[in-house]
Regions:
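Basic, polyanion-binding surface patches
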Residues: 1-143
């Protein structure tokens, strides 16, 4: 997971480099052994998913005829690492991790404790219309 603290290394690792380039020294981030897959995770990251390749889906050319080779890679999660410092009462404290998200263009956003919120999911009746929408904060019940 890319976080506020790892943003510079994450950005450096987005550079186009030859396929055999080890991006860890380039990024300044530290490799850590994974439990179920060969590739290492990023030690500085508070969370990581270990995945096995399932499918690579080619995307159409943005500009027809340019054949840039854009793909979506899909994997099965076979292992999860979460730093214990971010577990509160059995739940992940996402805000404390301060993950970042790619928005668009060169823009990113950061999740902070003061921007995280929880709300109840609505229940829906058999014909698919919303039967109950409780706008209050999440009550701890999964629906």
């Amino acid at each position: 997971m890319a976080t506020w603290d790892t943003r510079q290394g994450m950005n450096i690792s987005s550079a186009s480099v030859p396929a055999d380039t080890d991006e860890f020294p380039l990024s300044g981030l530290t490799p850590a052994a994974s439990s179920f897959v060969k590739p290492p995770r990023v030690k500085e990251s508070p969370a990581a998913f270990e995945c096995r390749h399932w499918k690579t889906v080619p995307l159409p050319d943005v500009v027809p005829g340019t054949e840039k080779g854009h793909f979506v890679v899909i994997g099965h999660v076979v292992g999860v690492y979460i730093d214990d410092r971010y577990i509160d009462d059995g739940m992940v404290n996402t805000g404390a991790m301060q993950p970042i998200a790619r928005m668009g263009y060169m823009e990113y956003s950061v999740v902070k404790p003061e921007t995280v919120f929880s709300i109840n999911r609505p229940t829906v009746n058999a014909d698919g219309t919303v039967a109950d929408l409780d706008p209050s904060e999440w009550d701890g019940v999964y629906r």
